[in-house]
Amino acid sequence: MKTFTAKPESVKRDWYVVDADGKTLGRLATELARRLRGKHKAEYTPHVDTGDYIIVLNAEKVAVTGNKRTDKVYYRHTGYVGGIKQATFEEMIARNPERVIEIAVKGMLPKGPLGRAMFRKLKVYAGTEHTHAAQQPQVLDI
């Protein structure tokens, strides 16, 4: 019997909505990355994007343990000499709460074109409203 390989055109992708309210950031991001890759499906193939679309709501209410709210630091670089910028978790949540979940999940996905395609299926919103009602997403309890 030959090994089954999923074809990109035959993959069925579902839409799921996840509420991040009170969820621990790392544990939530791990499960989101797993589902974006498609590892929860029997037809998972490493070189094919078999994952689902995921909508994350209430990104500003995501939880972190310990002192990470004040001690966890995110770094970025402007591209100019001496242009390193830093922001704590608290500042990131205040300024752009969606970005915190996006950074956590993106680091858990493959690097390269396939990983970027998987990351594009993640939709993160700060509040409880989203613009994907037409896709009829199912509620996913993580």
Swiss-Prot record:
Domain of life of the native organism: Bacteria
Annotated SUPFAM superfamilies: Ribosomal protein L13
One GO MF term attached to the UniProt entry: mRNA binding
Gene Ontology process terms (BP): negative regulation of translation; translation
One Gene Ontology term, aspect cellular component: cytosolic large ribosomal subunit
Keywords: Ribonucleoprotein, Ribosomal protein
A Pfam family this chain is assigned to: Ribosomal_L13
Function: This protein is one of the early assembly proteins of the 50S ribosomal subunit, although it is not seen to bind rRNA by itself. It is important during the early stages of 50S assembly.
Family: Belongs to the universal ribosomal protein uL13 family.
Assembly, per entry: Part of the 50S ribosomal subunit.
Record-given protein name: Large ribosomal subunit protein uL13
Protein source organism: Serratia proteamaculans (strain 568)
Source lineage: Bacteria, Pseudomonadati, Pseudomonadota, Gammaproteobacteria, Enterobacterales
